[in-house]
A protein has these predicted regions:
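Acidic, low-complexity terminal tails and accessory targeting/binding regions
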Residues: 1-4, 84-98, 141-144, 156-188
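Active-site-proximal alpha-helix that buttresses catalytic centers in soluble enzyme cores
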Residues: 1-81, 118, 166-183
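Generic beta-sheet signal
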Residues: 6-9, 142-152
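Residues immediately flanking
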Residues: 14, 152, 158
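Phosphate-handling substructures
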Residues: 18, 23-24, 28-32, 68-131
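Short, active-site-adjacent cap segments at secondary-structure transitions
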Residues: 61-62, 154-156
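A short, acidic, amphipathic alpha-helical segment used as a generic capping/interface helix at domain edges
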Residues: 128-142
Length: 188
């Protein structure tokens, strides 16, 4: 009988202030509410076995991991990886995709992705799905919960690639929310 229990939480970083128009916002840190919410998120996970958090190297994601660790109350290794941001597995060429993003905006990028249109510098739906599935599977430990902290764009694109989940302004990826996988199966 297999009693394995691999849980992966792919979540957006905690609350931040608005990103200045015309920028990527990589320097925007968590605000006070984000720090408190990340700490509280960690407290709620105390009954789970967590030893690692994988994080985008963007500072607000690393901060989120640190505050989750403080709330959890035990040592958690934080591993920064560009697979989750700066640029992330949804981006093949940061300069080309960044230029497209600044010229056209996120809404056009997301619509194009959902329609299967090739976006300059971005991964295809199929390659994003395969690369993220492989990354999460490789880094999720048996009988543990592993946390992956990233950005709303990667979550929205990846979730669509899994099961055509569409995020809108009304149901956008909230801070500290995302996709849960149990034994490799998407539960949300």
């Amino acid at each position: 009988m297999n009693t394995s229990n691999k849980i992966a939480l792919l979540i957006r970083h905690a609350d931040r202030d608005d990103i200045p128009e015309g920028s990527f916002g990589n320097d925007v840190l968590l605000n006070q509410m984000g720090q408190v919410n990340a700490f509280n998120y960690g407290e709620k996970l105390k009954n789970q076995q967590i030893t690692k958090i994988y994080s985008s190297p963007v500072p607000r994601c690393v901060q989120t991991a640190e505050f989750i660790g403080k709330g959890y109350g035990r040592t958690i290794e934080i591993i920064e990886t560009v697979a989750l941001g700066a640029p992330g597995l949804h981006i093949n060429d940061e300069k080309i995709a960044g230029k497209y993003y600044l010229e056209h905006g996120f809404d056009i990028m997301y619509e194009s992705f959902k329609n299967g249109t090739i976006i300059p510098g971005m991964a295809t739906l199929e390659s994003l799905n395969q690369n993220m599935n492989d990354f999460i599977h490789k880094h999720t430990n048996e009988n543990e919960t592993t946390i992956f902290i990233t950005h709303d764009m990667l979550i929205a694109f990846y979730h669509f690639s899994i099961n055509k989940t569409v995020y809108t302004k009304e149901n956008w990826v909230n801070y500290l929310s995302g996709i849960t996988f149990k034994n490799g199966v998407n539960e949300r």
